[in-house]
Amino acid sequence: MELAMDFALRLRDAANHHLSRYEPLVLLAAPLLALLAARTLHAAAAAVADRGLRTVLLALAMTAIKLLPGVSAYINAEKRKVVDQLQSGGTSTKSTLRTELPTVGLSNQVINDLETLKARDVNWQGKCSGTVYIAGSESEGHFALINKAYSMFSHTNPLHQDVFKSVAQLEAEVVAMTAALLGIKEKSSGGQICGNMTSGGTESILLAVKTSRDYMRTKKGITKPEMIIAESAHSAYDKAAQYFNIKVRRVPVNKEFLADVKGFKRCINGNTIMMVGSAPGFPHGLIDPIEELGELASRYDICLHVDLCLGGFVLPFARKLGYPIPPFDFCVKGVTSISTDVHKYGLAPKGTSIVLYKNHEIRKHQFVAVTEWTGGLYVSPTIAGSRPGGLIAGAWAAMTSLGLNGYMENTGHIMEVSKKIQRGIEDIPGLFVIGKPDMTVVAFGSDSVDIFEVNDIMSSKGWHLNALQRPNSLHICVTLQHTVIYEEFLKDLKDSVDTVKANPGPISGGRAPIYGAAGKMPDRGMVRELLVEFMDASC
């Protein structure tokens, strides 16, 4: 003991003697600077691990370049030119906006004004990828039915359950009918599927992510949450990550353009709260390997969300019709939540989606309860407080009016036309279909022509397709609107490819140069700034 004390004293004296050569301020600053350096190195290492060394070095280089005199002003001027070009198609209407209330109310004249504004919209019938999923004109048939249902309940709000009990029942029935489509009757699902209606796929996704975060914090104590998504997963997951402070680990798709299960596994760590699989993914219409992702989720005890926003009202019926649909719903072990849109192939009014959970224990983490508000006790199930009961009624009317037979018939039509479009594209020299489409989204690219120039020609013919990247490609999301016009689509597409082959190069007012440049631009921060500038100027 005495030897140890003696050694400690001698060590202290030696240290004091050595440090006596330095100023007290230096001794005080040294550990702080060391701590700062350590934190900087840790942050740099984390950035490299997340984004890759090349991306980090490029970002640093671009930041340094922008500090040079005149460079930042030049970049801003060029961004302004790009934004102006993007808006040249008439996207912005700020110059003609009404900015004040009329001095004297317009009374019924407003209907005429609305009709005038509506007449300026493009001719969307049959020419849009996705967008409008119901067949026919908006003034007849199924359109007229759901519009009437909406108008009957346009004054209602499910926030006031004690007043509008009818709407509460309608929502419960819509959720229950959807749960029945997605596995609640199967023993493997556990039979406790529950959920709520939301304003759209993005809100359903936001709620599923928020719920998974809070559930895993309670269950496993995770305070620095991470989620794993494929690079083909919908951008709403990035929005959720920004809103809820969740780190995204983005995994490249495999050679079949599907979620790479091995890549997902490599990303799992002690902070992982959830993984995401799409059925199908928005870009290419391909169903991720949900069963394999479910096995991973079960093994590591984390959440698995399945994005069925596109497929929820197609895949159950396509499977019944005999199409080779891989497992995708709550029957898959490990699936904890699902989002599905009624306003797409469910043929409900815009603004209707559903988020479902495997059981009530998980869903409880979706709710917000406030006990200390002077306005009273408050609890809300979704992001919105007040919600339009008319949309709930419209969704209920859509589902019950169509019934199983109606959805089966519709699915048969759009699946058949989707396959015809796929074969037609494959027959056009210079084009290829991406992956093996499972459903009603067909993505295609080209090795011989600029596909974005093809898109510009198609746009001049009235078509509105979705432009994709990695690889550069287009897709069409087939709806009932296309079942009577798909042959015209294929003819116009072939003619557009032939036109670009004969006259390569951008057309006046086309967006091919912008899309092409954006895809090749190594500084993704610059692309993000362009998008933000465009949105700020457009709304």
Curated annotation (Swiss-Prot):
SUPFAM superfamilies: PLP-dependent transferases (SSF53383). Keywords: Apoptosis, Endoplasmic reticulum, Lipid metabolism, Lyase, Membrane, Pyridoxal phosphate, Signal, Signal-anchor, Sphingolipid metabolism, Transmembrane, Transmembrane helix. InterPro entries: GrpII_AminoAcid_Decarb (IPR050477), PyrdxlP-dep_de-COase (IPR002129), PyrdxlP-dep_Trfase (IPR015424), PyrdxlP-dep_Trfase_major (IPR015421), PyrdxlP-dep_Trfase_small (IPR015422). The keyword Phosphoprotein does not apply. Its EC number is 4.1.2.27. GO terms for biological process: carboxylic acid metabolic process; sphingolipid catabolic process. It is found in: Endoplasmic reticulum membrane. The chain crosses the membrane at residues 55-75. It is an enzyme of class 4 (lyase). Cleaves phosphorylated sphingoid bases (PSBs), such as sphingosine-1-phosphate, into fatty aldehydes and phosphoethanolamine. Elevates stress-induced ceramide production and apoptosis. PANTHER family: PTHR42735, SPHINGOSINE-1-PHOSPHATE LYASE 1 (PTHR42735:SF6). This is Sphingosine-1-phosphate lyase. It comes from Oryza sativa subsp. japonica (Rice).
